Amino acid sequence: MEVTAKLRGAAISAQKVRLVADEVRGKSIERALDILTYSNKKGAVFVKKCLNSAIANAENNNGLDIDTLKVSTIYVDEGITLKRILPRAKGRADRISKRTCHITIKVGE
């Protein structure tokens, strides 16, 4: 049985989070949490939050034993992009893209 958790609208680009997601894909829950705890990437904070939610869902909603769980699927999709304006010299303006992403984690036995 697989249990899903989603984190939508995380304020970080999908490209940066995918680096962290590739590290924990297929690992056991305990190993994945260790990797995320000691990672120095900003995306690790968002992935760890979503993984803890998936663990809680598996334990409380489905009554699964968390010692036997592993990260079966993890993927990161692009969310909405917020467009912002940065004023420059001589009346010009640059566009700034504030990117977001959606993180989906499935844990199973």
Curated annotation (Swiss-Prot):
One of its Pfam families is Ribosomal_L22
Keywords on record: Ribonucleoprotein, Ribosomal protein, RNA-binding, rRNA-binding
- This protein's source sits in the domain of life called Bacteria
Report TM segments. Answer: none
Its Gene Ontology cellular component terms are: cytosolic large ribosomal subunit
* Coiled-coil regions listed in the entry: none
According to the UniProt entry, its GO molecular function terms are: rRNA binding; structural constituent of ribosome
Note the InterPro entries from the entry: Ribosomal_uL22, Ribosomal_uL22_bac/chlpt-type, Ribosomal_uL22_bac/org-type, Ribosomal_uL22_CS, Ribosomal_uL22_sf
Q: Which GO terms describe its biological process?
A: translation
SUBUNIT field: Part of the 50S ribosomal subunit.
Function (record text): This protein binds specifically to 23S rRNA; its binding is stimulated by other ribosomal proteins, e.g. L4, L17, and L20. It is important during the early stages of 50S assembly. It makes multiple contacts with different domains of the 23S rRNA in the assembled 50S subunit and ribosome. The globular domain of the protein is located near the polypeptide exit tunnel on the outside of the subunit, while an extended beta-hairpin is found that lines the wall of the exit tunnel in the center of the 70S ribosome.
Q: Which family does it belong to?
A: Belongs to the universal ribosomal protein uL22 family.
Entry protein name? Large ribosomal subunit protein uL22
